[in-house]
């Protein structure tokens, strides 16, 4: 329908852009290559504090690559090369002096497929806290609080110290992974297709949770489900062929998109 060259001829369409003072993360002219293949093209965007930002677009458009750039998960891919800046609370996380492991302690991530450890529910959530040196009653208090925030506590409170996280249902496992991520109080939580492997009831529980989480955290979610993006997000980014085509308030993107390619995707004419 459209060539990369045509997309790159035009700047990103922005509606109500996020002021620098309200941004937790400020991406500046970010490009990324896997070997010789370029996956992201000169992306600049800000992610506002205590809001949910959804990233949408057809398969292979660079959604997950952009998401994983926000906590340097792409560093784990052989041959990756990055140009540009990702400022997290004003610090460029790609500065050579910055430890990527330290970055990931501040930025939690929840993956497409739940990945609980083969440990008890308690030990799953306690894992990151123990690495931080949290012990004793404080450790238990923070585990319980994280399970409550992840809307899992009432379902597991009678067995969380003895039952393996692997015995939970898929939806419960995903909420356990969210509890594990938020236990260490990361200001930023990244979610890569967090409900794609779940049934509708479990999906609803995760969506309700996302809306609650933004009171304490900044959330960025990648989703193929446009209805989900419309339900849970405050702002939406539309990507195509590694280019950020349009960004703005979710209501604008879904009801009055300004770029013809955004409108074509939203109305189902491609993707």
UniProtKB/Swiss-Prot annotation:
Q: What is its EC number?
A: 7.3.2.1
**Known InterPro entries for this protein?**
AAA+_ATPase, ABC_transporter-like_ATP-bd, ABC_transporter-like_CS, P-loop_NTPase, PstB-like
Catalytic activity annotated for this protein? phosphate(out) + ATP + H2O = ADP + 2 phosphate(in) + H(+)
Per the record, its GO cellular-component terms are: plasma membrane
Location relative to the cell: Cell inner membrane
Please give the superkingdom of this protein's source.
Bacteria
Q: Which UniProt keywords apply?
A: ATP-binding, Cell inner membrane, Cell membrane, Membrane, Nucleotide-binding, Phosphate transport, Translocase, Transport
* Residues where ATP binds: 57-64
- Main localization of the protein described in the UniProt heading: membrane
Residues annotated as domain ABC transporter:
25-266
NCBIfam families reported in the protein's UniProt record: 3a0107s01c2 (TIGR00972)
Task: Tell me the subunit arrangement.
Answer: The complex is composed of two ATP-binding proteins (PstB), two transmembrane proteins (PstC and PstA) and a solute-binding protein (PstS).
Q: What is this protein called?
A: Phosphate import ATP-binding protein PstB
Give the source species: Thermus thermophilus (strain ATCC BAA-163 / DSM 7039 / HB27)
């Amino acid at each position: 329908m459209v060539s990369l060259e045509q997309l790159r001829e035009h700047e990103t369409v922005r509606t109500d852009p996020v002021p620098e003072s309200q941004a937790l993360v400020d991406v500046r002219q970010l490009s990324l290559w896997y070997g010789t293949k370029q996956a992201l093209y000169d992306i600049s965007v800000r992610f506002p504090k205590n809001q949910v930002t959804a990233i949408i677009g057809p398969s292979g458009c660079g959604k997950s690559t952009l998401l994983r750039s926000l906590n340097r998960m792409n560093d784990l891919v052989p041959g990756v090369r990055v140009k540009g800046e990702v400022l997290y609370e004003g610090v460029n996380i790609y500065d050579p002096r910055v430890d990527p492991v330290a970055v990931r302690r501040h930025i939690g991530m929840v993956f497409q497929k739940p990945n609980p450890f083969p440990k008890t529910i308690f030990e799953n959530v306690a894992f990151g806290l123990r690495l931080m040196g949290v012990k004793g009653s404080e450790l238990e208090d923070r585990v319980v609080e994280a399970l409550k925030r992840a809307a899992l506590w009432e379902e597991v409170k009678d067995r969380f110290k003895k039952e393996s996280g692997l015995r939970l249902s898929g939806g419960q496992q995903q909420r356990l992974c969210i509890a594990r991520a938020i236990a260490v109080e990361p200001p930023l939580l990244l979610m890569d297709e967090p409900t794609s492997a779940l049934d509708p009831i479990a999906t609803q529980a995760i969506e309700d949770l996302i809306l609650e989480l933004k009171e304490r955290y900044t959330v960025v979610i990648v989703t193929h489900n446009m209805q989900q993006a419309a339900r849970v997000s405050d702002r939406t980014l539309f990507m195509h062929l590694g280019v950020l085509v349009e960004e703005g308030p979710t209501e604008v993107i879904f009801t009055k998109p300004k770029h013809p390619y955004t409108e074509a995707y939203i109305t189902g004419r491609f993707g």
